[in-house]
């Protein structure tokens, strides 16, 4: 498993993943409408890590940000939240960032759970596309 340096936070890992993803997609940062950050190891209690990432990524101050503190189900939960936000028609592009530096809190002496965890950050891009009526089917 991977262990981040003690000076590295979850936002550092997600920042690197997000910058690469935005570059690969050739997205303008101003076009990103929401950023949701999922972690059990946020950088701070306050301010929200999503707001820190919004600033570090250079996103618009109009970009909606939200932290979600969940473990295994966090990514799926955040996907549901972004999907709901986008289906309202007010948001087109979003970033789902998930990261943890959990090994700072884990003991390598705990042989039952320590091997299950690692430090990582991920970035997922989502873009809303309306379906034409002719492409929709009812069941």
Q: Model regions: which residues?
A:
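Flexible, glycine-rich active-site loops centered on histidine and acidic residues
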Residues: 89-120
């Amino acid at each position: 498993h991977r262990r981040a340096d003690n000076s590295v936070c979850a936002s550092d890992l997600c920042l690197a993943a997000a910058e690469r993803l935005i570059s690969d997609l050739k997205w303008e940062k101003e076009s990103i409408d929401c950023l949701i950050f999922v972690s059990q190891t946020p950088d701070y209690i306050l301010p929200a890590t999503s707001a820190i990432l919004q600033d570090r990524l250079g996103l618009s101050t109009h970009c909606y940000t939200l932290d979600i503190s969940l473990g295994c189900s966090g990514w799926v939960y955040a996907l549901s939240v972004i999907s709901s936000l986008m289906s309202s028609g007010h948001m087109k592009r979003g970033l789902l960032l998930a990261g943890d530096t959990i090994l700072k809190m884990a003991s390598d002496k705990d042989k039952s759970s320590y091997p299950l965890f690692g430090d990582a950050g991920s970035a997922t891009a989502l873009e809303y596309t309306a379906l034409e009526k002719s492409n929709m089917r009812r069941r």
